[in-house]
Amino acid sequence: MSLKKKRRRKFNKKIAIKNLLVLLICISLSLITIKTISSSFKKPNENHNTNNVIKPAVSPKVENTNTEVLLSAVGDCTIGTDSKFNYASSLPAMAQNQNNGFAYYFKNVRSILSKDDVTIANLETTFTDSNDKADKQFNFKASSDYAKSLTLGSIEGVNISNNHIYDYKEKGFLDTKNALEKEKVNYFGEGSKWTTKIKGQSFGFLGYRGWSLDKRFLDKLKEDISQLKKTNSVVIINFHWGAENAYYPVAAQKDLAHFAIDNGADIILGHHPHVIEGIEQYKNKIIAYSLGNFCFGGNSNPSDKTTFIFQSNLKFVNNNLTSIGVRVIPCSISSVNYTNDYCPTLLASNAKVNLLSNLNRLSDNAGFEISDKFFYINTKKTSIN
């Protein structure tokens, strides 16, 4: 073969090799392109990297907030005397004869009152040194120091709306409020409201002399309740009403109590008759028509010395009142039965049984048996009243 032909063959061989290399490069590029396009069309769930997976949010479980508030209430506390009474047998003299001083009056019930969350009473006296009396049959007073007896007795609030708060006119009224404020005892009634938080729950305490059913008074009562309900408060009203020595409420008491509950009140507590009256359940709320006397300096030896401590255990779920527990603790206004020593004392044995039996007889609209154990009323239940 000529040198010329050999060169041509060698050249053709180089061309063929180059063409083959070009072909291989094209095939490789095509495969890479196909793989890239295929990867771009993968579904999201084909990505197996769990770190990039967005999981749905799980809401934390919300626990209900449950709260209980224990309220105690007692009746007429006339911590004073009338100047016409025999001083030797009077309430002030009794404490002076004891080593307990001002702690004497509530020493036999303090074990109960100190274990609740709040205790209220009807304060039916004045704390004043004024001698300018109102023109009436009885005028009760004690010096301002006697307000200490309330604090020592674990009483946090008092109703001052009654027929003895002005026994020594406006001066006596103002002196009484000043004495209470000095001892940090809250008061309500006669234009004052007591609003407070107890264990985070809102409470409003109101007091009135409840002998009137005229429109002006009812409108005022309705407005006072409405203002408290705007703050989701439990509304507790004290009414000084009824007839003395009457064991059953008169029609006006029932009408006023029902009106108050119809407009949002939760518990109604009554006093003035100086004896106990029945308890009523109305629209899943509670009315105690008369708590009777308690620490009562208005009589050195009343024939009926029975009384009781009214207690209500209020249960809340998420700041809403869901049930009202009711019980009574039978007491006597005196630690002895032959006179009034002005020292309320728990009853036991037959005396306790007899008081509970009598109170149930008087409470024909209670809807449950009243005892010293709590009975709970569901406030959210549809009422049949």
Annotate each PLM feature.
Residues 26:
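Electropositive, gly/pro-rich neighborhoods at or near active sites that engage anionic ligands
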